[in-house]
Amino acid sequence: MQTSEREGSGPELSPSVMPEAPLESPPFPTKSPAFDLFNLVLSYKRLEIYLEPLKDAGDGVRYLLRWQMPLCSLLTCLGLNVLFLTLNEGAWYSVGALMISVPALLGYLQEVCRARLPESELMRRKYHSVRQEDLQRVRLSRPEAVAEVKSFLIQLEAFLSRLCCTCEAAYRVLHWENPVVSSQFYGALLGTICMLYLLPLCWVLTLLNSTLFLGNVEFFRVVSEYRASLQQRMNPKQEEHAFESPPPPDVGGKGGLMDSTPALTPTEDLTPGSVEEAEEAEPDEEFKDAIEETHLVVLEDDEGAPCPAEDELALQDNGFLSKNEVLRSKVSRLTERLRKRYPTNNFGNCTGCSATFSVLKKRRSCSNCGNSFCSRCCSFKVPKSSMGATAPEAQRETVFVCASCNQTLSK
């Protein structure tokens, strides 16, 4: 009895005692997959390799449309128009079958004839372009991987910029920000629909092909160039007469003298200090090739310089020159003498340290010997009086000289 009562009361539970629900364990957070930028770069490289035939085909089409070879582009345009107008339906099916079978045959032959390279050969040829499976087998060093990632990011940024510009242009057309462009766009769409409805497909293709080849800017550029060349061939005598026509003679023969004499500017500061600063700053501002400088110096030397004594006599005898004009003529003669000194270094190098002159390594001429030095080798300052100047200002005015001249003048 008791056993049966226990068995009967076993499944019954008091209302106050409720069974505890099994506690559900909180789900563990799933680990997010790690992002590997280098794997992204490898995938991009593989995609480039897969799309390489399409890229080459696009480059070829752009080459023809830009009329880089005018004869080839003209023959292609005429040939396509003839094919579009003459081929019937059966011929088009044959062309489609040929376009499918030729790439398939080329791919099969390439796979059959391709040599299998071992790992060592792949590592040796790593600096060349790698193919599909080679990208997964060749290990790149860290600098190479960083360079690949940088190149990928640069290309991605350029692609996104072009895409944003294209989307902005499309939104401007759709939102009628420029009514002229939007009207042209929608008018072209309506005209295309009407043309597709009214004309046969062969004529539509012919018009589209002619528009692509003959309606771009490059075609008009080529036409203008050929027109100019034909005009030159047809009228060569007129151009020769135009080039050989002499300039109008000067009235009284005074034009040449007026052009050769420099204009006097009385407002310039012609004090000895300013003249010396101009002479010191002049060699630093000249950044010419040494070869050109050598030719100029040789030409100037061949012309011959006047005798200093004759210059002094001419200046003393001429009573019409003012004091400023005399000073200007003296400064110009001194500058010409400095420029006519033949440099010892014909290749644009410093005489002291053989450094090549550039924008950063400026040329400086020694005021005593006239050779070309850099600013470091020609950095010694000596008073003008040490070089024989007797003016009162020569005691306090200094000039730049090289190291050897500094030792000679300091003794």
Swiss-Prot record:
Key regulator of RAB11-dependent vesicular trafficking during neurite extension through polarized membrane transport. Promotes axonal elongation and contributes to the establishment of neuronal cell polarity. Involved in nerve growth factor-induced neurite formation in VAPA-dependent manner. Contributes to both the formation and stabilization of the tubular ER network. Involved in ER morphogenesis by regulating the sheet-to-tubule balance and possibly the density of tubule interconnections. The keyword Nucleus does not apply. It is found in: Recycling endosome membrane; Endoplasmic reticulum membrane; Cell projection, Growth cone membrane. Residues 1-92 are annotated as: Sufficient for homooligomerization. Residues 188-208 dip into the membrane without crossing it. Pfam families: FYVE. Zn(2+) 2 binds at residues 366, 369, 402, 405. One of its GO terms (cellular component) is dendrite. Coiled coil: none annotated. Residues 276-286 have a biased composition (Acidic residues). Keywords: Cell membrane, Cell projection, Endoplasmic reticulum, Endosome, Membrane, Metal-binding, Phosphoprotein, Transmembrane, Transmembrane helix, Zinc, Zinc-finger. Can form homooligomers (monomers, dimers and tetramers). Interacts with RAB11A (GDP-bound form); regulates RAB11A. Interacts with FKBP8; may negatively regulate ZFYVE27 phosphorylation. Interacts with VAPA (via MSP domain); may regulate ZFYVE27 retention in the endoplasmic reticulum and its function in cell projections formation. Interacts with VAPB (via MSP domain). Interacts with RAB11B (GDP-bound form), REEP1, REEP5, ATL1, ATL2, ATL3, SPAST, SURF4, KIF5A, KIF5B, KIF5C and RTN3. Residues 286-292 are annotated as: Necessary for interaction with VAPA. It comes from Pongo abelii (Sumatran orangutan). The chain crosses the membrane at residues 67-87, 89-109. Residues 1-66, 110-187, 209-411 are cytoplasmic. A zinc finger (FYVE-type) spans 344-410. Residues 88 are lumenal. Phosphorylated. Phosphorylation is induced by NGF through the MAPK/ERK pathway and modulates interaction with RAB11A. Residues 1-205 are annotated as: Sufficient for localization to endoplasmic reticulum tubular network and for interactions with REEP1, REEP5, ATL1, ATL2, ATL3 and SPAST. Residues 51-64 are annotated as: Necessary for interaction with RAB11A and function in neurite outgrowth. This is Protrudin. One of its GO terms (biological process) is positive regulation of axon extension. Residues 271-361 are annotated as: Necessary for interaction with KIF5A.
